[in-house]
A protein has these predicted regions:
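RNA substrate-binding interface of SAM-dependent RNA methyltransferases
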Residues: 1-92
Length: 92
């Protein structure tokens, strides 16, 4: 009998350090997280192929090691909005 597998999501809310956010992306990628929600003042990854980046985006890219390309992510104003989105999308 096949085991039921839950869909995993991660909400990163009000984490100031781009280095820490990049590390969370890398860890989420390894753990099989399907989607990451970024909310509050949490920094977002740089655009794909971006050349001009802020110091925070450079720090993110250095620690994420490309995980932002393999884990879907979405920006939300609040963590509550992210929770509502994940509930509607069937994350448990």
């Amino acid at each position: 009998m096949a085991a039921h597998r839950r869909r995993l999501a991660l909400i990163i809310h009000n984490v100031r350090s781009a280095h820490n956010v990049g590390s969370m992306f890398r860890t989420a990628d390894g753990a099989g997280v399907e989607m990451i929600a970024l909310s509050g003042y949490t920094p977002v990854p740089p655009e794909h192929g971006a050349v001009a980046m802020t110091a925070a985006q450079k720090s993110f890219r250095k620690t994420a090691l490309g995980a932002e390309a393999s884990v879907a992510w979405k920006r939300f104003r609040t963590a509550a909005e992210a929770i509502g989105f994940f509930r509607k999308e069937g994350f448990g």
